[in-house]
């Protein structure tokens, strides 16, 4: 309860947005000596022309370009004291770097060279890019919860959003595949530049110069429309056990963010089980559980993922989780609704404060024109609205269940619904 606790007015952080030479730019200044710069590309796995090509294209970033070799870039990066990160999502490829504030011109130029003048050489694909992509996949597949959520996406959407984020060995990506995809993605229509702790006017001027001769291109689109499906996936592995219960959503709504926050999962304090319905479902077990909502604009996926060593305990928690969703559809109290709102607001603010996640969020908004997670846009829903959303999900005609690990001992969909 927060009755009687004073609250202070908090100033919202704002990014100034503009277009520079046809490229969308968002930036905000700050007092830190470290700047953060990201290039967000509309080219995630949902747009992949062949399986895994988005992941491979991401790993080609900062390989040999016409102006300089990969080795030269590495040496220069170390001289400047900067750091480089890249990752791929279902919707975007993100190239991100951190550096001392005065070195902004160098890194804007480096990003522009990646998009305009990467050589895409066969030996790089064979000796550098493909092995790194394989290690990336192996690292993620060591987590059964990741594998379960990936499998749930594949069942729910099949193609497009159902495409694997990571390149898979069974479907090799050729150099021509990468070149063709790069020609589509590396275009002004698919690029957003996001700067944290940079002077907005400086970034806009530098982008306007460095990206001026980047091809105009056209918006990358998904092949075919997004369709929703129900079903099951059973993945036998020895890396651990996990179960994802997923419910595809045809019309994404902000209320599902609040519902995921309400159902919860991980405790807010390390020595506490937590008071959320899903946290209570794990009492007496050695399992972890979390509700997540994945909003992709044209569709969504509400997921509850359970992980643990014991298949019997996972099965027990899964039944309780489904019941918790049904119970939420029956009744939500005012206090529970207030708790869901506070957690949603905090999660959105936390994402905005983290330079990595904020770059993805802001870049996504620049490219799509739709705000999905800004803290000031988080709505406060009534208990009735939360109950209605939960009731609609629990009555879904297309539930998805993805089991990973000792699948012979994990529940099937018809045992849960």
Swiss-Prot record:
Membrane-topology annotation of the record: Peripheral membrane protein
Chain segment of the transit peptide: 1-22
Main subcellular location: mitochondrion
Keyword Iron-sulfur: no
GO CC annotations on file: mitochondrial crista; mitochondrion; respiratory chain complex III
Annotated SUPFAM superfamilies: LuxS/MPP-like metallohydrolase
Record keywords, A-Z: Electron transport, Membrane, Mitochondrion, Mitochondrion inner membrane, Respiratory chain, Transit peptide, Transport
Any one biological process term the GO annotation gives: proteolysis
Compartment(s) where it occurs, according to its Swiss-Prot or TrEMBL record: Mitochondrion inner membrane
One GO MF term: metal ion binding
Domain of life: Eukaryota
InterPro entries reported in the protein's UniProt record: Metalloenz_LuxS/M16, MPP/UQCRC_Complex, Pept_M16_N, Pept_M16_Zn_BS, Peptidase_M16_C
Main function: Component of the ubiquinol-cytochrome c oxidoreductase, a multisubunit transmembrane complex that is part of the mitochondrial electron transport chain which drives oxidative phosphorylation.
Family listed: Belongs to the peptidase M16 family. UQCRC2/QCR2 subfamily.
Quaternary structure, from the entry: Component of the ubiquinol-cytochrome c oxidoreductase (cytochrome b-c1 complex, complex III, CIII), a multisubunit enzyme composed of 3 respiratory subunits cytochrome b, cytochrome c1 and Rieske protein, 2 core protein subunits, and additional low-molecular weight protein subunits. The complex exists as an obligatory dimer and forms supercomplexes (SCs) in the inner mitochondrial membrane with cytochrome c oxidase (complex IV, CIV).
Protein name: Cytochrome b-c1 complex subunit 2, mitochondrial
Organism of provenance: Yarrowia lipolytica (strain CLIB 122 / E 150)
